[in-house]
Amino acid sequence: MYRLKKLLYKILPTSWYLACMQRGFFLLFDLGILKRDARFKFHYAAKKLLTETDVVVDIGANLGYFSKLFARKITQGKLYAFEPIPDFHRRLSIILRPFPNTELVHAALGAEAGILPMVMPVQSGVLRTGLPHIISEEEARNHAAVQRVKVLEAKEFFSQLPKLDYVKCDIEGYEWKVFSTLEIELQRLRPVVQIEISERFIEEFCAFFNRMGYVQCGLYEGQLVQENGTQRETSDFLFVPQEKLDHIFATFNR
């Protein structure tokens, strides 16, 4: 697979390469071929974690591998998908077009509004589509290919939501910048939160959600389980409000 990606990235324009990656993922996903790959266990679990009327926010929607699955499920709900990179945003707009209950936002979320530098890493001749990330201005001076992206204030956006059931966040090390500003809104809205956490922030996040009455959970051998700090399987973290725990466990593990 790696050699194929390297060849495609070498011979195709970036937009075509991204289209191939996107279409290839959903073909393999829908055929069930990715079920045995632990990297995609939350993708297959999404339909069991959501209901048709849920309001979902996808922070760092990327190529839409989660966004499209969310949109398929929440037919009577609402999806807000945030993606600041122009090439990725274009691909997202195509695959989410059939879903009128989605709102695609061409921006990142951050602690404050503004413009920040972002990079898309190319490693060993392959564009790492899952690793674009915001960098500092000092780091930007040492990168040849930097994109300036729009950032909206996360707290301001969340404060406008009357209802929120689920948040997915994958923003490659920038997650604490966002969530450290959201305690008041998370307390008000009480969504389930699925988040990829950089190792250096695990302790802060666990304490943060514990303080708000959330329970740390994860997926282990196909089941939803309670976790404590480092997880049994490397994957996203799932934080569930204590008052929703019994219902989610009963629904997921039946």
Model-derived features: where do they sit?
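Phosphate/nucleotide-binding beta-alpha loop and adjacent structural elements of enzyme active sites
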Residues: 1-254
